[in-house]
Amino acid sequence: MAEGGASKGGGEEPGKLPEPAEEESQVLRGTGHCKWFNVRMGFGFISMINREGSPLDIPVDVFVHQSKLFMEGFRSLKEGEPVEFTFKKSSKGLESIRVTGPGGSPCLGSERRPKGKTLQKRKPKGDRCYNCGGLDHHAKECSLPPQPKKCHYCQSIMHMVANCPHKNVAQPPASSQGRQEAESQPCTSTLPREVGGGHGCTSPPFPQEARAEISERSGRSPQEASSTKSSIAPEEQSKKGPSVQKRKKT
């Protein structure tokens, strides 16, 4: 029993010894160029065209993570950038171990940067403390005690921005401007209210010569025209509808 157990244990040990040798033999060298690289996610693929000094007929994709890149600063690869690398075979496929530029130089990297990091930065323009008005901090970081409310336009504590006299003088409302212009312009109508249609303007007295000219065109004298108009006016006011038309015909 003891011998069998020893022999069984001795059988497992020889099987475990070759594993490090197999891992070491899997580390290979290759050259190629960056196929694509996602700067936000931090990974991409290398298109390997040469393996252990022998060219490949068909390029092979090798996974690359930014932690494997040999360079300073923000680590990334530019599409089409030539690289040299060591890689191994894993359960997921070929993975790079160390990636450098040609001749072991640092990688160049991509000019692109993640958009999320730039959006997170606060823009200093327009930021100010709502407590004291300072530009170098915000209200939650203000060292002064709570200050009284004041007008945001002229910084006065006597009124709020809605009642600021300086703002109202500087920017008069458009409606008041239009109303003032309409009131300032005199009525330019030269026709009397009877002829012009009642614009609400006081027209100058109608000259006698113009009345005579109008009556001559209509074939009546000024007296007849005025008398006819005065006789028809009360009848039109007292009667409506078809009766008015009958009166005009007769």
Curated annotation (Swiss-Prot):
A motif (Nucleolar localization signal) lies at residues 239-250. Zn(2+) 1 binds at residues 129, 132, 137, 142. GO terms for cellular component: cytoplasm; cytosol; nucleolus; nucleoplasm; nucleus. It is found in: Nucleus; Nucleus, Nucleolus; Cytoplasm. A zinc finger (CCHC-type) spans 127-144, 149-166. It comes from the Eukaryota. Induction: Might be negatively regulated by the microRNA let-7b. SUPFAM superfamilies: Nucleic acid-binding proteins, Retrovirus zinc finger-like domains. The keyword Repeat applies. InterPro entries: CSD (IPR011129), CSP_DNA-bd (IPR002059), Lin-28_RNA-binding (IPR051373), Lin-28A-like_Znf-CCHC_2 (IPR054081), NA-bd_OB-fold (IPR012340), Znf_CCHC (IPR001878), Znf_CCHC_sf (IPR036875). Residues 173-191, 220-231 have a biased composition (Polar residues). Residues 210-219 have a biased composition (Basic and acidic residues). Suppressor of microRNA (miRNA) biogenesis, including that of let-7 and possibly of miR107, miR-143 and miR-200c. Binds primary let-7 transcripts (pri-let-7), including pri-let-7g and pri-let-7a-1, and sequester them in the nucleolus, away from the microprocessor complex, hence preventing their processing into mature miRNA. Does not act on pri-miR21. The repression of let-7 expression is required for normal development and contributes to maintain the pluripotent state of embryonic stem cells by preventing let-7-mediated differentiation. This is Protein lin-28 homolog B. It comes from Homo sapiens.
